[in-house]
Structures are given as structure tokens and as C-alpha cells.
Amino acid sequence: MYSSPLCLTQDEFHPFIEALLPHVRAFAYTWFNLQARKRKYFKKHEKRMTKDEERAVKDELLSEKPEVKQKWASRLLAKLRKDIRPECREDFVLSITGKKPSCCVLSNPDQKGKMRRIDCLRQADKVWRLDLVMVILFKGIPLESTDGERLVKAGQCTNPILCIQPHHISVSVKELDLYLAYFVRERDSEQSSSPRTGIASDQEDTKPNTLDSTDFQESFVTSGVFSVTELIQVSRTPVVTGTGPNFSLGELQGHLAYDLNPSSTGMRRTLPSTSSSGSKRHKSGSMEDDIDTSPGGEYYTSSNSPTSSSRNWTEDMEGGISPNVKTEMDKSPFNSPSPQDSSPRLSSFTQHHRPVIAVHSGIARSPHPSSTLHFPTTSILPQTASTYFPHTAIRYPPHLNPQDPLKDLVSLACDPSNQQPGPPTLHQARPLRTVPSWD
């Protein structure tokens, strides 16, 4: 029920995603998909791709539409947001956007207390360590899923086991890497028409280089399909190059919870969607919870999705919300009969988040006004009527009014349009059940 277009729209326009999307490298989309295609080909044909086949896949991925890459990046950022501890999310955004010096960003550990792993594609059978994903996503470094041992955390990192701050992660370079880099530099210098500077140009020095180049070609075979120049070029290209397909970064200025204005000195905001992550995280520590793909291929079918994290665990199971929130949903402009009747995606999002954000006014419209993040542990939803995060993808069937005491026991998996309006009808056997009925 969480895979509706309206729900995905809210995921894609979350302030966390809006602020980080311009800093994601477009190369990450090509790299993750290329590794998945190679793995799928090997499983199907029991042999590796040829260079021509792999090069064709690479060219296909590089020429993909920008909106496809941005949609993938938005979903992956939403997935990563769940795995970052709530108290570290704001620091992570500010450090990536350059508004704050880099500090440790701790992730939620798995059941063994180690770094979690997630899948980066729909219905993927390979999982990647979170720190590897961060390095590929924000630095554009082509790392394999088995390169976790090559990552080295910075000395100022207070928790090297769980820190996923990209600025605290370096890739260790071995002697072989330096050896290969020497020949790459020499070959580029020989092919360049400009005179060589900084390197001896005597004939006695050039002869050994020619011999070494021959030995290099005999000793090493390039397994990838990226040239050096192409690899550097694509790894520096951001996934957002100007105006995106569904929104403009200029239009988002002033509506983000994470202020993109460098002159802003402080932030006062609330994150109601993150308040329940700390209380629910102990339930999902295994690797199976990382792979949140459904049979249809959507990411956010689990109860840990960003749009559903503002409800408690009983509502995640039963698909219901409190009467107060339902009353506010009825008053909300988002509660339209159909997605076609609603406003465009950007205007819907900005109107949706405007009551929550008080970056420019300096006033936090929250039950707990504070300059720092506040994560209540006693209650996930406010006890009074509120307009925080009304979930427009969840509506009651017409035959259930907002005051029906049994609405939390009714499954919303069925299409509400199939229900016939009429007076409330109660079944005799179902009020005693504590789990939803899926028939």
C-alpha cells in the first residue's frame, strides 16, 4: 500500500533528499547497475561478459535519462536515511553541503554490532556495506562490493566501526596501485603533444620507459571498460546538472528544512518523520531487513520507510492512524479524491512541509521548539491534533467514519474505491481480533 505514486512523490521530495541530491555523483548509477548486469549475466550464462558486451551496457547506462538517475538516487538516499541514526542526520546533511565541518555520522548496526549492508537496486541479490555506498555515491570512486577492507577511517573518527561519513573514509592504496599509476601517467605524457615538464627528458631516461611500457602491456590486462579519462570525467559529474525533471533547486530554496543559503547561521526545525526511528530500530537488525524490495520491485513496502516512520508499530501492522491525524487529513489540501485532482508534485510537497519548517523565520512550529533535534520517546504521534506529515496515501474506506473505534483493526490493503458507501457495519467475530484481516 506504500508504493502508490503519491507516496513515492513524498519520498522523493523529502528535505533530506533534496539537500543531498545535488551532491550525488551520476557515476554511482552507472557503476551499481553495471555490476548488477555483469552478475546477472554470469548467473544466466555461466560465463562473464565479453568486453564488447560490457562496453555496450556501459554506454547504455551512461546515456540513461537524467530523471531516471535522479529517481534512483532519491530512492537510495531515502534508504540510507533510515540507516543513519536520527541524531546524526542533520550533521550529515550539513557536512555534505559544506555548512558544517565533517563529524562522525553513525549508522544503525546490525545484530552483531557491525556495519549494515543494503541493496542499492531493485530486486538486487547483492548487498553493499554502507560506507562503501557512501564513498561511491558522494566521491564517485569505483569500488567493488568486496573492497570494504580497503577503506580506512580517519584519525579523528570516534567510531570507525559504524561511521559512514564520506569525509572520514579513505581508500588505501597498495604498491600495485602506485605501480599502475606510474605507467598511466607516462603513457598520457607520451601521447600529449605538449612538452613534458617535471620529468627528465634525456634520451637515456626515455629508452627504459619504452621498454617498461612494453613489459607493462605484457604483464597486465585491463578488465574494465572505462578509460582513465572517461572514468575521471564521469566520476565528477553530479546526478543533478541544472534543473531536474520534476523540480528545480532554485524553487526548492526557502522550502527545505536544510537551508541551502550559506549566510544562514542557524537552523530551527522539526523532523517528525524521524522521531520513531530510534524506537523501532531494534526490531530490524538483520541483513534481511536491509533488502526492502517487494515483488513489484518497489523499495518502500516495509514499515521502516521514511513516509511511514511517523506511525507506531501497531499502526504499521494494521494500517491505521489516530483519529486526530485523520481529522487533520480531512482538512488538509492533500485529501483530494484522486491524484489527478491534486496540485503538481512540487507545490504539493512545499505546501505539505511548510507547517513543519521554520528555517527562515527562526520560529520552530513544533510541540517541542528547540534549536536542536528533539526525538520524543514517549509518543510517536502528537497527542493533540496536528498537521505533521499527513499520509495522503492512506485513506479510510467510505463506510468507515473518522470516529469508528474499530478502524485500526481494518486492513487497508483493499482498494477503497471498491467499497460501497453506507452505514457502518460491524462483524461479530472480528472485534476480538488483534491482527488485520487480509481477506
Curated annotation (Swiss-Prot):
Q: Which SMART domains match?
A: DWA
Query: What keywords would UniProt list here?
Result: Activator, DNA replication, DNA-binding, Nucleus, Transcription, Transcription regulation
Provide a Gene Ontology MF annotation, just one. Answer: DNA-binding transcription factor activity, RNA polymerase II-specific
Q: Where is this region: Disordered?
A: 191-214, 260-349, 415-439
- Specify residue ranges for compositional bias: Low complexity: 301-310
One of the GO BP terms on file: DNA replication
Q: Which Pfam families match?
A: CTF_NFI, MH1, NfI_DNAbd_pre-N
Q: What is its main location?
A: nucleus
Q: Where is this motif: 9aaTAD?
A: 404-412
- What do the Gene Ontology cellular component annotations say? nucleus
Q: Where in the cell is it found?
A: Nucleus
Q: Which residues bind DNA?
A: 1-195
Q: Does the keyword Nucleus apply?
A: yes
Spans of biased composition, class Polar residues?
Answer: 333-349
Description of how the protein assembles with itself and partners: Binds DNA as a homodimer.
Question: According to its UniProt record, which protein family does this protein belong to?
Answer: Belongs to the CTF/NF-I family.
Name the job this protein performs.
Recognizes and binds the palindromic sequence 5'-TTGGCNNNNNGCCAA-3' present in viral and cellular promoters and in the origin of replication of adenovirus type 2. These proteins are individually capable of activating transcription and replication.
Domains: entry comment: The 9aaTAD motif is a transactivation domain present in a large number of yeast and animal transcription factors.
Q: What is this protein called?
A: Nuclear factor 1 C-type
